[in-house]
Design a protein with these regions (language model features):
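Acidic/histidine metal-binding catalytic segments
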Residues: 35, 52-58, 97-109
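Alpha-helical, largely C-terminal catalytic domains
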Residues: 10, 91-92, 110
Length: 143
């Protein structure tokens, strides 16, 4: 399987990333799946342009899972959709053997992706999920 590269950004190719992709692609409608992929690419480009160092796997997981709480399969709790998605991402990542602190970082990225400004004061992966969402949905940061 060849790597997917768009605008010089390569999608990580680990088994974890393949499993994340499979789950989201099978759970979300195509519009949401493709939006989530764009969030990864936009966030990665923003990070590259700002000279930020980040973990592409964590950014990809955060980007792909960030709207999973909007899907029929993962919504329905009394929580905000961001928390539903963040909880599922953390569960999935922990079950896959991701260390708790890395899974929590993805949880924070997803939980805060609709909160302007705050993520920029946190870990790069958290900031870049939000940056990718803002660019794909609102055009913020397109310069």
């Amino acid at each position: 399987m060849s790597a997917t590269v768009i605008a010089g950004i390569e999608v990580p190719s680990s088994s974890l990333i393949r499993d994340v992709t499979e789950l989201v692609q099978s759970s979300a409608p195509p519009l949401l799946y493709h939006h989530s992929r764009r969030v990864f690419f936009w966030g990665s480009m923003r990070g590259r342009n700002r000279g930020m160092t980040y973990d592409p796997e964590l950014l990809y997981a955060g980007a792909l899972f960030h709207d999973l709480g909007l899907t029929d399969r993962f919504s329905g709790s009394e929580q905000r959709f961001e928390i539903d998605g963040a909880d599922e991402a953390r569960r999935f990542l922990l079950d896959a053997g991701v260390p708790p602190e890395r899974a929590h970082l993805v949880w924070e990225a997803i939980a805060l992706h609709t909160t302007p400004e705050v993520p920029w004061h946190m870990a790069p992966e958290i900031a870049l999920v939000t940056a990718g969402v803002e660019l794909d949905v609102l055009g913020l940061g397109y310069d």
